[in-house]
């Protein structure tokens, strides 16, 4: 199958998202073109990856690069959200500086969303900005986090509170790598795909309802779903690179979702990002229904679809105890979307009719969360 190319067009730069099969082995064909742009230069780059991806795919990537006389410095970190931390970031930076990579050299972020965020953030601050390439290996990273330039790490006070906007040179998306992805991780990425339909593409959501089984199987329908999702994300980023307006819609489910990730201390045994987003989207829809913006029937429809994909949708689906509603509210207060101590949520008027709700009353959110806890006990 011929690779698809989607171009992200921004005010100051543009870059391609290349989607196809067996692109890891062929990545050097794309990457070496960036070295030619720099003139005579020893071809060197760092590969930031995690233990899981390294075991499965690093040798294939390095072999292809080596065959094209590109020297690589692999930097392998532990898999999981807990690696999005200052100590791990420091380790990556130290290894890149110790290898004497220059500003004109590149960093490949070869992994899921955690690696993309870590590698991109490191690239943005080392020598005031190195080049970097996204090579996403999870569905979530392929359709969402690798596109748009958001990078960063977590804090004890909340998720993604330390970071930068920093665009890659390109995104190389090998759909074959998804065949080795654990089902739980694929489901988590699917939650972000559903999110795009819920934002402002009701026809896409309906298409997902009809094609969910095919998307979970390797084949052309999966590739189409990935390409459509990437195009949607690319279009929004092109219109609003720094999240001054419309791009905030991409945070549907994320205010509640980040709250839950912080509450579970980023413990993947309890909750991973896409699962948090799935629960967060249902909470956003339930809150919208409580405000009489939508009918409970629509909430049920969306929840039924997420459940059919094997995703959690309720607080009680999270293993272990959660903090009380008051403590959860303190996590929401640290959310990046808070402005002048006013809460901002992405809510909805209907299927594909999401909107940015500013000045949401904190008392209303607290009451809503207390009701959720009452129902779980």
From Swiss-Prot:
Cellular localisation: Cytoplasm
InterPro entries (alphabetical): Dehydroquinate_synthase, DHQ_synth_AroB, DHQ_synth_fam, DHQS/DOIS_N, DHQS_C
Main function: Catalyzes the conversion of 3-deoxy-D-arabino-heptulosonate 7-phosphate (DAHP) to dehydroquinate (DHQ).
Alphabetical list of Pfam families matching this protein: DHQ_synthase, DHQS_C
Binding site for Zn(2+): 192, 254, 273
Enzyme nomenclature, EC number: 4.2.3.4
The entry's keywords: Amino-acid biosynthesis, Aromatic amino acid biosynthesis, Cobalt, Cytoplasm, Lyase, Metal-binding, NAD, Nucleotide-binding, Zinc
GO cellular component, one term: cytoplasm
Molecular function as annotated in GO: 3-dehydroquinate synthase activity; metal ion binding; nucleotide binding
Family stated for the protein in its record: Belongs to the sugar phosphate cyclases superfamily. Dehydroquinate synthase family.
Keyword RNA-binding in record: no
CDD domains: DHQS (cd08195)
SUPFAM superfamilies (UniProt xref): Dehydroquinate synthase-like
Protein name according to UniProt: 3-dehydroquinate synthase
Main location: cytoplasm
Cofactor stoichiometry and binding remark: Binds 1 divalent metal cation per subunit. Can use either Co(2+) or Zn(2+).
Binding site for NAD(+): 113-117, 137-138, 150, 159
Pathway annotation: Metabolic intermediate biosynthesis; chorismate biosynthesis; chorismate from D-erythrose 4-phosphate and phosphoenolpyruvate: step 2/7
Any GO BP annotation: amino acid biosynthetic process
Cysteines engaged in disulfide bonds, as pairs: none
Catalytic activity: 7-phospho-2-dehydro-3-deoxy-D-arabino-heptonate = 3-dehydroquinate + phosphate
Cofactor: Co(2+); Zn(2+); NAD(+)
């Amino acid at each position: 199958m011929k690779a698809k190319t989607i171009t992200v067009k921004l005010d100051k730069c543009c870059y391609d998202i290349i989607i196809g099969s067996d692109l890891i082995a062929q990545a050097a064909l794309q990457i070496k073109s960036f070295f030619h742009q720099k003139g005579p230069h020893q071809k060197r780059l760092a590969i930031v990856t995690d233990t899981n991806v390294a075991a499965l795919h690093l040798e294939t990537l390095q072999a292809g690069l080596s065959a094209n006389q590109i020297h690589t410095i692999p930097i392998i970190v532990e898999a999981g959200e807990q690696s999005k931390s200052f100590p791990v970031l420091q380790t990556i930076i130290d290894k890149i500086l110790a290898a004497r990579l220059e500003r004109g050299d590149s960093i490949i972020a070869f992994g899921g969303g955690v690696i993309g965020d870590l590698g991109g953030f490191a690239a943005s601050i080392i020598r005031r900005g190195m080049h970097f390439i996204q090579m996403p290996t999870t569905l979530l990273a392929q359709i969402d986090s690798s596109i748009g330039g958001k990078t960063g790490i977590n804090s004890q006070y909340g998720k993604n509170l330390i970071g930068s906007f920093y665009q890659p040179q390109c995104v190389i998306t090998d759909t074959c790598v998804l065949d080795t992805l654990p089902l739980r991780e694929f489901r988590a990425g699917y939650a972000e795909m559903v999110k795009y339909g819920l934002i402002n593409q009701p026809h896409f959501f309906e298409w997902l309802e009809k094609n969910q089984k095919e998307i979970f199987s390797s084949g052309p329908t999966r590739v189409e779903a990935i390409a459509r999702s990437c195009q949607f994300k690319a279009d929004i980023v092109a219109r609003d690179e720094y999240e001054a307006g419309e791009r905030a819609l991409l945070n549907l489910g994320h205010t509640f979702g980040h709250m839950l990730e912080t509450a579970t201390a980023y413990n993947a045994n309890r909750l991973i990002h896409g699962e948090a987003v799935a629960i967060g989207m249902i909470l956003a829809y339930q809150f919208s229904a409580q405000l009489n913006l939508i009918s409970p029937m629509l909430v049920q429809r969306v929840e039924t679809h997420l459940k059919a994909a094997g995703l959690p949708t309720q607080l009680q689906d999270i293993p272990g105890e959660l903090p009380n509603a008051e403590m959860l509210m303190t996590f929401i207060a640290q959310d990046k979307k808070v402005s002048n101590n006013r809460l901002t949520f992405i809510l909805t008027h209907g299927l594909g009719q999401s909107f940015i709700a500013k000045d949401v009353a904190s008392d209303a959110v607290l009451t809503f969360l207390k009701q959720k806890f009452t129902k779980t006990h």
